[in-house]
Amino acid sequence: MRYTSGAIETLIDEFARLPGIGRKTAQRLCMHMLNEPRTAAEKLAKALLDVKDRVIRCSECQNVTDRDSDPCVLCRSSGRDRTVICVVESPVDLLAFEKTGHYKGLYHVLHGVISPLDGIGPDDIKVRELLARVSRPEESLQVREVVLALNPTVEGETTSLYISRLLKPLGIAVSKIARGIPVGAELEFIDEATLSRAMEGRSAM
Amino acid sequence: MRYTSGAIETLIDEFARLPGIGRKTAQRLCMHMLNEPRTAAEKLAKALLDVKDRVIRCSECQNVTDRDSDPCVLCRSSGRDRTVICVVESPVDLLAFEKTGHYKGLYHVLHGVISPLDGIGPDDIKVRELLARVSRPEESLQVREVVLALNPTVEGETTSLYISRLLKPLGIAVSKIARGIPVGAELEFIDEATLSRAMEGRSAM
Ligand SMILES: [Zn+2]
Ligand SMILES: [Zn+2]
């Protein structure tokens, strides 16, 4: 048995296509939209199309930005240290660093990591664009350090190594963010791999 | 810190307005749409507007139906017993009964329950429309029984009592669905109120 409305069925189907949205949730969302004014549906519909029509990748850092704002606000900002580039996998990771408010350099978004098993090679992510950025002759744009901030997965590590080998011959300092005990975490609840990394990465006091 | 794209921020805001969708989930859904082809966004956008433009309430049973299908398929069906009407709170509850495949009568959807604390009175839900249905003089449409299938809440019980008092003087049999132990449930895990109800509602074997 399905709903007595084809329009309702279709909207439930479309909601259920979204990741992490099951049929029960899709049904609840659809019923919610039924009870909302038409303007609510219009706003969500417009936002969906706008994201497809207006969002592009910044020609500098490959971060997401609006069509009428390229390079992105971060790349255009006069308050950023242009000698450091932090390399991240996704715009969400970039946002995580920005939220800390501590990092003041530039970014480069790879939009993925090298993953041979998934058929993703260096040319499928934004490695070439990174290389172009750090190779520019203009003195004012000289990048001195690239900080790799990829996820601690096998693919992330592989990608970090690959990029590091490309950049070092260019005389650029390449670093990697520290792995260790999260702030506020209790040692007894930390997994062994993290503990080992924390021990390896110990620093003098 | 927000995204470097206004279009992305707007879509996250709109997703986060949906019930049960937090900001993290909204962010994930937005990133998903960014990676989908434009047709995926178009389909969801169209489905949202269609639900507002095409869905109406059946003039007979108040169930949701499409504009070009009134009365709804259930009310038009020749295979239903027109002497019984099952009264439910919402289209979702109607669907739950239809899924069982056992009930073959008609329905009436109240679209809510009487709730004085929320300022919802009998005229704010579809009680008047139910009264009109059972009061029709045509012999062929004569309703003999109304089954109240509202949720076992204070408001549901109040509404059941209210409707029952309206219908009984009209010579219509009014019944209420049984409360009791769910099929397959183990007694030890059933709450006391349900156990008491099950005991009260015991039937001869
Ligand atoms: Zn940028
Ligand atoms: Zn109907």
From Swiss-Prot, chains A, B:
Keywords: DNA damage, DNA recombination, DNA repair, Metal-binding, Zinc, Zinc-finger
MF annotations from Gene Ontology: DNA binding; zinc ion binding
SUPFAM superfamilies, per the entry: Recombination protein RecR (SSF111304)
Entry's Gene Ontology BP terms: DNA recombination; DNA repair
InterPro entries, sorted: DNA_Rcmb_RecR, Rcmb_RecR, TOPRIM_dom, TOPRIM_RecR
Kinase recorded as keyword: no
Residue span(s) of domain Toprim: 83-182
Signal peptide location: none
Chain intervals annotated as zinc finger (C4-type): 58-75
Function statement: May play a role in DNA repair. It seems to be involved in an RecBC-independent recombinational process of DNA repair. It may act with RecF and RecO.
PANTHER family recorded: RECOMBINATION PROTEIN RECR
Family: Belongs to the RecR family.
NCBIfam families associated with the record: recR
Name listed for the protein in its UniProt record: Recombination protein RecR
Source organism (scientific name): Chlorobium phaeobacteroides (strain DSM 266 / SMG 266 / 2430)
